[in-house]
Swiss-Prot record:
Zn(2+) 2 binds at residues 59-60, 132, 170. It comes from Shewanella denitrificans (strain OS217 / ATCC BAA-1090 / DSM 15013). Monomer. Its EC number is 3.1.2.6. Thiolesterase that catalyzes the hydrolysis of S-D-lactoyl-glutathione to form glutathione and D-lactic acid. HAMAP family: Glyoxalase_2 (MF_01374). This is Hydroxyacylglutathione hydrolase. Gene3D superfamilies: Ribonuclease Z/Hydroxyacylglutathione hydrolase-like. It is an enzyme of class 3 (hydrolase). Pfam families: HAGH_C, Lactamase_B. Its cofactor is Zn(2+). It catalyses: an S-(2-hydroxyacyl)glutathione + H2O = a 2-hydroxy carboxylate + glutathione + H(+). Keywords: Hydrolase, Metal-binding, Zinc. The gene is gloB.
Length: 258
């Protein structure tokens, strides 16, 4: 069974420490800075076995060099070759599975272009490490890809088993809820989730992970096929909506300017 722990960093990032419950070998996902990771590993008597990277942005890769310096360049660092990330030792090109030696679990590699063109998500048992593609009640900005690519990537993640947990890289949930309530103010699932998140954050508890089943019920970016979201988008932009891609494209534009 996996044990997954969040290391908070910067204003709203989470670096995820992943290990088997009975093992002291651990991996870290998207370390944007080295020292909090080193501090956690030492404080919990763990051995850092490697680094897993979803995409190239600095708040996800900025800690690679510091970790290699501390561990004398002995760390394997896995990440997408297409992202051109300095410090990657094991480039992922066309592979769809990855074996992390000390994790005793197969890692499914899921290409999710949109936020960046080479962005990957990783499915480990029932945990989805999706970087900046899917957030709780939201999705990432489209910096390099197209709306069609991002929608396809989100659809791919949405098709995974509903019991999977979403380990995204940022604590954006409350701000995403504020937007979602503007889009679908009468969604009872969203209202209930908003109440839970507000209490958790007031107690300084992470809102993550979220369950995919929850996201399918509350996340407007995963519900662009629904009448409720289509109608809201059509009203906001005073236009006729013809398909799901148009809904998603305009919804993302709405959020960008929210």
């Amino acid at each position: 069974m996996l044990t997954i722990t969040a290391i908070p960093a910067f204003n709203d990032n989470y670096f995820w420490i992943v290990r088997q419950a009975d093992s002291n070998f651990a991996y870290v996902v998207d370390p944007g800075v080295a020292q909090p990771v080193i501090d956690y590993i030492l404080a919990h008597d763990l051995i850092l076995a490697g680094v897993l990277i979803t995409h190239k942005h600095a708040d996800h890769v900025g800690g690679i060099q510091g970790l290699q310096d501390f561990y004398q360049n002995s760390l394997p660092v896995y990440g997408p070759k297409a992202e051109g990330i300095a410090g990657i030792t094991h480039e992922i090109i066309d592979e769809r599975t990855l074996c992390l030696p000390h994790l005793e679990a197969n890692v499914e590699i899921i290409p999710v272009p949109g936020h960046t063109l080479g962005h990957h998500a990783y499915l480990i048992e029932d945990a989805i490490f999706c970087g900046d593609t899917l957030f709780s009640v939201g999705c990432g900005r489209i910096f390099e890809g197209s709306a069609a690519q991002m929608l396809a990537s989100l659809t791919k993640l949405a098709s995974l088993p509903a019991h999977c947990k979403i380990y995204c890289a940022h604590e954006y949930t409350q701000s995403n809820i504020n937007f979602a309530l503007t889009v679908t103010p009468n969604n009872p699932n969203l209202l209930q989730y908003a109440s839970w998140v507000a209490k958790a954050r007031a107690d300084n508890i992470p809102s993550l992970p979220s369950f995919l089943s929850t996201e399918l019920a509350v996340n407007p970016f995963l519900r662009c096929h629904t009448y409720e979201v289509k109608t809201a988008v059509a009203s906001q932009f005073n236009t006729e909506i013809n398909d799901e891609l148009q809904t998603f494209t305009l919804l993302r534009k709405w959020k960008d300017n929210f």
